Amino acid sequence: MAAEDIAQLADCLAKANVGDGELSFKGKTLKLNTAQDAEEVIREIEEYEGLQALRLEGNTVGVEAAKAIAEVLQRKPDLKRCHWSDMFTGRLRPEIPTALRSLGDALITAGAQLTELDLSDNAFGPDGVRGFEALLKSPTCFTLQELKLNNCGMGIGGGKILAAALTECHKKSSAHGKPLALKVFIAGRNRLENDGATALSEAFRLIGTLEEVHMPQNGINHAGITALAESFKANSLLKVINLNDNTFTEKGGVAMAEALKTLRQVEVINFGDCLVRSKGAQAIASALKEGLHKLKDLNLSYCEIKADAAVSLAESVEDKSDLEKLDLNGNCLGEEGCEQVQEILESINMANILGSLSDDEDEDDDDDDEDDDDDEDDENDDEEVEEEEEEVEEEEGGDNENKEKSKEIPCLSGSAPASPPKLPVDASTFLSFPSPEKLVRMGPRRSAMIAQQVNVADTEKVVQAFIQVSSVYREDGEIKAAVEETIDGLMKEAFENRGFQANVFITSLLVQMGLLKSEDKMKTIPHLNGPLLTLNHMVQQNYFPKSLASTLLAFISKPNGVLENNASARHTLLCNLHNL
């Protein structure tokens, strides 16, 4: 290590002790490859008496450094909270399980009693779960209350390994007279799918003490949702259920509603982007009428819910005095339906809880019953997101142009044959009021249309166009592809234009994202997930000047509350920036 690097590290360490038994190296971007690199970190850990929490997130720890840190952790029996998210950036996947195994073995040797383990944003895959499997099964985790594994790429295999480890932990801890009492489980963006979710549901049912479950964006369909719903019935203390961006359909919606009827402590329900549809929403409305009196936040946005079901939901919250937010945006209420919902809430003095309805779609004429029949006929095909989409393809002769197939785009399925086709969207219409559906409806020429509409020599206009396009980003394949294709067309032309100022573009974009202060007061982007993931795509393209990577890296890696709320997207972008 160079002398100046050691001095910088020492300065960081001087500020690391944050009290309450916590030693923090959070966001220091330390590159700890060898035992020598980790000497100062090890010294600080060694000298910290009564260490209860260790923050290593936002650094990168290699196998040798992990082994060296593990040696000192063997002498820290008071350690309770391990904040070890995002600490393997730039590491090869095979390195991570070895490093985790060393650290885990050290905690076991020390006789530590963990209450919190956070390994989020470490892309270790199924093999990585093997790296801390022994730790989870050991007495060190008998006291575990919070397990955070967001965005780790576990997949189905990793989900099954994790479920088995939790089950064994509960079994062993029960034998010792104090069963595992896990309260918080976080595992979003892991592609657990039905099999992984079902395996975990068995562990949840056994544990029975969960208060928060966060499993968004896992590709779970109605079979997995139903299994989770059954397990939730055994967890009567549940307060937060976040299954955003999975695929319930009516079956999953009804099953989850039945589970909600048995729960009395629920405060937050996030089923946004879950394709609950009207019958699922009606079932949830019924559950609301029967209970859920502590509910504070209900998100059923982008679920293909029609006006009648939305009205039922509005009527069902009348006695929910704690309710602070009801999100029904992006559904199929139509203008009259929106007005009805607003009038109902106004009549019970709850108009203030309703979120924006700006992305609402007109109510289609199709019948949910037809869609539901399709679901019933397709028992063996859990991997299909929307069976009725296949019917639309057949009716249209297999023509894919201007076809809306994503579950993220509300109410695009099951159109009656007599319904007139939706007209294509032009660039100016999209840029005025961006939405995922409009971008898809622009068709295969969307990239050229946007690039032609925007004066790429005007850097600020390119910034605005980038923000507008990236704001509709979704993980769904069709929308994601449309966003990336459009950005490629726009930015390739911009970077090749002599009048375009690349450095100004990056600076202005950082300001708009709230990551760089500006002397002028301006409104920043409220949601950064789409822009961050779109940036992640852009920086990997040949047209992107690699000289700009250092600027982005400097600001994206800095501690920032807004970025911490988008940790998964931030981690993905940082990994690719480090690799440039």
Swiss-Prot record:
GTPase activator for RAN, converting it to the GDP-bound state. Converts cytoplasmic GTP-bound RAN to GDP-bound RAN, which is required for RAN-mediated nuclear import and export. It comes from Xenopus laevis. SUPFAM superfamilies: ARM repeat, Ran-GTPase activating protein 1 (RanGAP1), C-terminal domain, RNI-like. It is found in: Cytoplasm; Nucleus, Nucleoplasm; Nucleus envelope; Chromosome, Centromere, Kinetochore. Belongs to the RNA1 family. Residues 356-429 are annotated as: Disordered. GO terms for biological process: nuclear export; signal transduction. One of its GO terms (molecular function) is small GTPase binding. May be sumoylated. Pfam families: LRR_6, RanGAP1_C. Transmembrane segments: none annotated. This is Ran GTPase-activating protein 1. Residues 358-399 have a biased composition (Acidic residues). GO terms for cellular component: cytosol; kinetochore; nuclear envelope; nucleoplasm; nucleus; perinuclear region of cytoplasm; spindle. PANTHER family: RAN GTPASE-ACTIVATING PROTEIN 1. The keyword Repeat applies. LRR repeats lie at residues 48-71, 111-134, 141-168, 207-230, 235-258, 292-315, 320-343. It comes from the Eukaryota. The keyword Hydrolase does not apply.
